[in-house]
């Protein structure tokens, strides 16, 4: 999806402010029937990406498994920390598709409940300046 630039010129459509952290949402609403005629990239995606978490003692990640007990959080290998990037989902655990969000600070209440797939490693201060309706111009992925 990134290689096809489907996120280019998409807006940050929701910013949720908590006392210690912000959640900054963007992506493509699946129900909007996004359809790129030239590349036929997406056509009404619904819940195609399962919840994925990685536990310390497991070799492979777990799919569709959600940690609800706070005691289980210590078994995770990835946590919501400043700059984390994760998939948005509806109430169902395997309902992620083309929407994502960033957190601007640690947010342990989300640990084990959302798939973290990236992190801002450069320019974190810019993340904290994003306003609702700002546009995505470019996404760069590095290892």
Please tell me what each predicted stretch does:
Residues 1-143:
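Cross-family detector of peptidyl-prolyl cis-trans isomerase
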């Amino acid at each position: 999806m990134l290689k096809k630039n489907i996120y280019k010129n998409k807006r940050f459509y929701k910013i949720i402010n908590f006392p210690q952290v912000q959640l900054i949402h963007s992506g493509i609403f699946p129900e909007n029937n996004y359809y790129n005629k030239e590349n036929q990239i997406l056509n009404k995606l619904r819940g195609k990406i399962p919840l994925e978490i990685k536990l310390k003692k497991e070799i492979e990640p777990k799919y569709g498994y959600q940690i609800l007990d706070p005691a289980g959080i210590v078994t995770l290998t990835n946590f919501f920390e400043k700059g984390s990037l994760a998939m948005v989902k509806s109430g169902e655990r395997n309902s992620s598709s083309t929407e994502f969000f960033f957190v601007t600070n640690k947010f342990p209440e989300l640990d084990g409940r959302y798939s973290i797939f990236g992190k801002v490693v450069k320019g974190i201060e810019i993340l904290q300046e994003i306003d609702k309706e700002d546009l995505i111009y470019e996404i760069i992925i590095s290892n």
